[in-house]
């Protein structure tokens, strides 16, 4: 049933986004780093599973700490110039010619425009955040559930077990910059727009992982 529903969701959206979120974006950035190193790619599915440990931790922190009354709504809507500069600053070091940054920006620009266009929806969600948080908590499994599944199938449970293994700096970079590479909207994007302290969040999820 779940597989069928997933297929329907992808068909209706004309995209894989319903089954491909923040964790997939992290894996894609790790692949991008590997390609530019260059070195062989680690197994994508295993990278996604390990990234899920990070993102489910991030979800739990978000559920626990986010309070709409504490945000400045105007600051949640950066300009195109601001975000283009951020994308270019993130990816230009790995590709001085700018091709990677240009490709990332082409996708990201679509997402940024959509975020601005749906501001009223976000404001409505903020008003109903208590109910939304309760619903989302029931849908997002905690990281220890993912860990139990990985152990049950004898899968790697740490990035250091991947072959080849990314460095901690590369994982940190991927976690922080994954929202900048695709037009799908994930928790990572919301955290960027909320101006969440990414370094603090990284230390929290990395410590928990």
Regions picked out by a protein language model, each given a short descriptive name:
Residues 1-63:
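Core active-site phosphate/anionic-ligand binding loop and the adjoining beta-turn-alpha structural block
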Residues 66-209:
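C-terminal charged capping/lid subdomain of soluble metabolic enzymes
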């Amino acid at each position: 049933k779940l597989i069928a529903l997933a297929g329907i969701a992808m068909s209706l959206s004309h995209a894989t986004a319903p089954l491909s979120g923040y964790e997939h974006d992290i894996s894609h950035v790790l692949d991008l780093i590997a390609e530019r190193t260059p070195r062989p790619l680690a197994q994508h599915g295993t990278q996604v599973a390990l990234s899920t440990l990070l993102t489910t931790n991030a979800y739990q922190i978000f559920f626990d700490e986010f309070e709409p009354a504490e945000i400045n709504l105007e600051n949640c809507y950066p300009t195109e110039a601001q975000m283009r500069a951020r994308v270019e600053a993130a990816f230009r070091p790995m590709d001085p010619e700018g091709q990677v940054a240009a490709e990332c920006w082409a996708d990201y620009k679509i997402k940024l425009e959509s975020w601005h266009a749906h501001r009223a929806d976000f404001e409505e969600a903020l008003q109903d955040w208590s109910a939304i948080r309760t619903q989302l908590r029931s849908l997002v499994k905690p990281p220890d559930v993912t860990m139990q599944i990985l152990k049950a199938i004898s899968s790697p449970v740490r990035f250091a077990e991947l072959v080849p293994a990314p460095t901690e700096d590369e994982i940190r970079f991927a976690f922080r910059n994954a929202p900048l590479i695709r037009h799908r909207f994930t928790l990572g994007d919301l955290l960027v727009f909320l101006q969440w302290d990414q370094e603090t969040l990284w230390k929290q999820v990395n410590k928990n992982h």
